[in-house]
């Protein structure tokens, strides 16, 4: 996500709001990040949207950040009128906007995509190569598109990867996996990527189905470790799971600290009011 363009727009908006305030006017209408000056914005902690808001504050923008562990809490805030907008990933916004047009509206979308990848511990390059091949296989055989259509209503993965030859899976690269289990770290409060069904007992979502497909191809049982997103990377560092499949945005900082796959889905930041 190219935050500099957004930040420049916000700073310009802050100056405009200042001029308006001096003339006696005031507005809380949010149409873009340029309107964040003086606004209350709900966001999930440790996400790129949260990072972007914090950067705005550091640059002097007077935006009140309302951070929550789960994105569901952000939309609860918005529905109850406790915030002016939610700053969130487009894949999540689409879930809340479907059939809820009377409650929520998407008013702005970032121009540039924000790719998401699977995250592994630094140095686990063999497993990284295997996971890349497996994702390619899901694109090659059309399964990735099926999973996307199931959870988003359309194939939002179209064009993310182009695979014209059937990949080869080298299962000898599973040497770091123990006890025949593929352990996945994720945060089950991010629909439609990963969340629980109405009973609260079963994990469902795009990333959940993706993990199960990987387990099937690898001949492994899949086990999920549900944790908060702001602590998910610490769990990977401690070896609590083999990888993170949790709508992880690919950033230079994460690529330096971890092994990140190429994108398996692309995303954008949006503002929902």
Where are these regions (language model features)?
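Short, hydrophobic alpha-helical packing/hinge segments within bilobed ligand-binding/sensory domains
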Residues: 73-77, 83, 92-93, 210-211, ...
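Extended ligand-binding regions for polar small-molecule ligands
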Residues: 23, 47, 117-159, 208-217
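Acidic, polar ligand-binding/catalytic clefts
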Residues: 25-35, 100-112, 122, 208, ...
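Bilobed "Venus flytrap"/periplasmic-binding protein-like clamshell domains
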Residues: 26-71, 90-94, 125, 186-191, ...
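Periplasmic-binding protein-like
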Residues: 90, 94, 98-133, 155-165, ...
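Extracytoplasmic small-molecule ligand-binding "clamshell" domains
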Residues: 64-68, 89, 130, 170-171, ...
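Ligand-binding clefts/hinges and TM-proximal coupling segments of bilobed small-molecule sensing domains
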Residues: 48-63, 106, 135-175
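C-terminal motif of bacterial Sec signal peptides marking the signal peptidase cleavage site
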Residues: 17-21
């Amino acid at each position: 996500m190219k935050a500099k363009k957004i930040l420049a727009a916000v700073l310009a908006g802050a100056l405009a709001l200042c001029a308006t305030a001096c003339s006696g006017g005031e507005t809380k209408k949010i149409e873009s990040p340029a309107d964040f000056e003086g606004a209350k914005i709900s966001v999930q902690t440790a996400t790129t949207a949260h990072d972007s808001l914090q950067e705005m504050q550091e640059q002097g923008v007077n935006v009140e950040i309302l951070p929550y562990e789960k994105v569901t809490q952000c939309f609860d805030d918005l529905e109850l009128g406790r915030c002016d907008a939610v700053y969130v990933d487009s894949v999540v916004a689409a879930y809340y906007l479907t059939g809820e047009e009377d409650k929520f509206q998407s008013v702005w979308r970032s121009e540039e995509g924000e790719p998401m990848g699977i995250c592994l511990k630094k140095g686990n390059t063999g497993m990284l190569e295997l996971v890349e091949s497996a994702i390619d296989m899901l694109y090659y055989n059309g399964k990735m598109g099926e999973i996307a259509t199931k959870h988003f209503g359309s194939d939002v993965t179209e064009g993310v990867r182009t695979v014209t030859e059937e990949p080869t899976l080298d299962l000898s690269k599973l040497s770091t996996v123990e006890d025949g289990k593929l352990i996945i770290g994720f945060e089950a409060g991010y629909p439609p990527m990963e969340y629980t069904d109405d009973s609260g007992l079963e994990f469902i979502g795009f990333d959940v189905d993706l993990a199960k497909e990987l387990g099937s191809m690898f001949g492994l049982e899949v086990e999920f470790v549900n944790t908060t997103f702001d602590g998910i990377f610490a769990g990977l560092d401690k070896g609590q799971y083999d990888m993170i499949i949790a709508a992880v945005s690919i950033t230079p900082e994460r690529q330096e600290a971890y092994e990140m796959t190429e994108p398996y889905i692309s995303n954008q930041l949006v503002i929902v009011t």
